């Protein structure tokens, strides 16, 4: 159950369109489901505002499918799967309607959330080889309802490439700087902006 659904449920009780016993039954649903190999936290969205995400690394295709299926059955509108390999994507995609991006290894099932309108997240890379990690961050942020601006190959070896995007950097509410070969990108960005900078 998501927080919005819980608020709607309580409003129904307050308005008299649902009785207290019906509401109690809905709220009593197990907060987690034990599949033997995984315990799915169905109430995470209600507590934290964001539903549980499936970390695909190390899980079998069948395990990923069963977790995603259980989430959908309990009413989770969007299921995000990170670090999903192609074999798992094929397996899950044959059983559920899956969108898969091979570069970022992100799988997505369900309805994309409406953008929250709370500003933009900038994802910047030092070089082209950093793009897969950056895309994982960008697609995850988008799946969680954020607007994302991508600034790729803007490393400090050619600082003019970064400075050419100063307006976008200044408008960001948070910046994710992905730079595997050079550690300076996050520091340089941090010296230019007043928002949080996450270094990867």
Predicted region positions:
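Short glycine-rich or small-residue beta-strand-to-loop segments that form or flank ligand, phosphate
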Residues: 53-54, 120-126, 175-177
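Short, structured coil segments at secondary-structure junctions
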Residues: 94-96, 192-193
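Glycine-rich oxoanion-binding loops at beta->alpha junctions
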Residues: 106-110, 147-171
């Amino acid at each position: 159950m998501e927080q919005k659904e819980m608020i709607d449920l309580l409003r129904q009780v307050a308005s008299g369109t649902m009785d207290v016993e019906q509401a109690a039954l809905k709220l009593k649903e197990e907060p987690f489901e034990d599949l033997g190999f995984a315990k799915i936290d169905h109430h995470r969205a209600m507590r934290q505002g964001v539903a549980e995400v499936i970390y695909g690394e190390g899980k079998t295709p069948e395990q990923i499918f069963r977790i995603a299926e259980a989430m959908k059955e309990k009413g989770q509108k969007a299921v995000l799967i990170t670090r999903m390999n192609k074999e798992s994507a094929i397996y899950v995609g044959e059983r559920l309607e899956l969108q898969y991006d091979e570069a970022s290894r992100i799988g997505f099932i369900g309805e994309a959330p409406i953008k929250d309108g709370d500003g933009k997240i900038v994802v910047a890379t030092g070089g082209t080889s950093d793009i897969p990690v950056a895309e994982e961050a960008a697609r995850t942020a988008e799946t969680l309802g954020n607007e994302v601006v991508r600034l790729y190959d803007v490393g400090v070896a050619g600082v003019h490439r970064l400075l050419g995007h100063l307006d976008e950097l200044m408008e960001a509410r948070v910046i994710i700087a992905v730079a595997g070969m050079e550690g300076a990108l996050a520091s340089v960005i941090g010296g230019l902006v007043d928002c949080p900078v996450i270094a990867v």
